[in-house]
A protein has these predicted regions:
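Conserved alpha/beta-hydrolase "acid-adjacent" motif
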Residues: 110-111, 169-174
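Catalytic active-site module of serine/aspartate enzymes centered on a nucleophile-bearing elbow/loop
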Residues: 189-219
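Short alpha-helical segments and helix-capping/turn motifs at coil-helix boundaries
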Residues: 82-85, 144-149, 171-173
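Short beta-strand/loop motif that positions the catalytic acidic residue
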Residues: 156, 162-164
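Alpha/beta-hydrolase fold active-site neighborhood
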Residues: 16-141
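Extracellular/periplasmic catalytic domains that process cell-envelope and extracellular macromolecules
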Residues: 91-92, 153-156, 178-181
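Low-complexity, glycine/alanine/valine/leucine- and proline-rich hydrophobic stretches
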Residues: 165-167, 175-200
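The feature captures the conserved acid-bearing segment of alpha/beta-hydrolase catalytic domains
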Residues: 1-33, 147-155
C-alpha cells in the first residue's frame, strides 16, 4: 500500500510542468489565493497526499496507475489533497492558530521526494503559509496545555472513552494507556480512519462502549 501511494506522489511530481497549468485553472475556478508560488503549492499537495489518504481511509485501489493521463492523476490528487488546505482565509484557520500555539502539528518528510520538489524544506510550513498574514512568524509553540492535559489524565481517573481509527495518522498522538486506571478506556477501530465513531465500531466494541456509558449515566 505504501509503495503504491509513494509511486503516485512521484508520478505527479515528475509531471509537474503538466500539472501546474491544471492547478492554476483549479485555483482560478475556486478563487483561491496563496502566500507561496504555485509550484510550491503543488509540492505541499503531494506531501499532504499520503496523510490525507490514510486519514480518511481512502482505499489505495482508487489510486490511478502511473500510466494514467495527466487529468486523471490531477483529479485524484484534488479529490484527496486539494490546495484549498493551504490557501489563505480558510474556515479552519482558527484551528491552525491553536495548533501553532498549543497543540502542535505534523510535519512532512521531504527526503524521498527531494529531487522533484521546488521547496528546499517543509520545516515550519504551518506558520509560514497557513496562519493569518498578521501572525506569520509571530506565534511560538507553548506546550503548557499539552502538559496540563497529560498530567490531568495521568494523575486522575476521569470517566472517559477514547476512540481512534487504526490507520488514521492522527492516532499516532493518541492518549497513553496509563497503568492502574479503572475508568480510562481506549478503543481502536480495526482499519478505521478519522471517521471512527461509536456507531460504526465493530459490534462487540460498540456494545462494550454503550454498556459502559449507560452504566456511568446511571450512577
Amino acid at each position: 500500500e505504501r509503495n503504491k501511494i509513494q509511486d503516485f506522489q512521484f508520478e505527479v511530481l515528475k509531471r509537474k510542468s503538466d500539472m501546474l497549468p491544471l492547478l492554476e485553472s483549479y485555483r482560478k475556478n475556486k478563487n483561491l489565493t496563496f502566500r507561496i508560488p504555485m509550484p510550491e503549492v503543488l509540492d505541499y499537495c503531494v506531501l499532504e497526499y499520503s496523510f490525507a489518504l490514510w486519514q480518511w481511509g481512502t482505499s489505495v485501489s482508487t489510486i490511478p496507475s502511473k500510466s494514467a493521463d495527466d487529468q486523471a492523476l490531477f483529479d485524484h490528487l484534488m479529490e484527496i489533497s486539494g490546495p484549498d488546505y493551504f490557501a489563505e482565509n480558510q474556515p479552519n484557520i482558527s484551528f491552525f492558530v491553536q495548533a501553532a500555539r498549543e497543540l502542535g502539528y505534523y510535519g512532512y518528510d521531504v527526503k524521498p521526494f527531494k529531487k522533484y520538489l521546488t521547496i528546499d524544506s517543509a520545516h515550519g510550513y504551518l506558520n509560514r503559509i497557513m496562519l493569518p498574514g498578521e501572525l506569520v512568524d509571530k506565534v511560538d509553540f507553548r506546550p503548557a496545555l499539552y502538559h496540563k492535559i497529560y498530567n490531568f489524565l495521568k494523575d486522575n481517573d476521569p470517566k472517559m472513552i477514547f476512540i481512534y481509527g487504526e490507520i488514521d495518522p492522527w492516532s499516532a498522538a493518541m492518549v497513553p494507556a496509563f497503568k492502574g486506571k479503572k475508568n480510562e478506556q481506549i478503543y481502536i477501530q480495526p482499519r478505521g480512519s478519522h471517521r471512527a465513531r461509536i456507531g460504526n465500531m465493530p459490534e462487540d466494541m460498540k456494545e462494550r462502549i454503550l454498556t459502559q456509558m449507560n452504566k456511568w449515566l446511571a450512577e
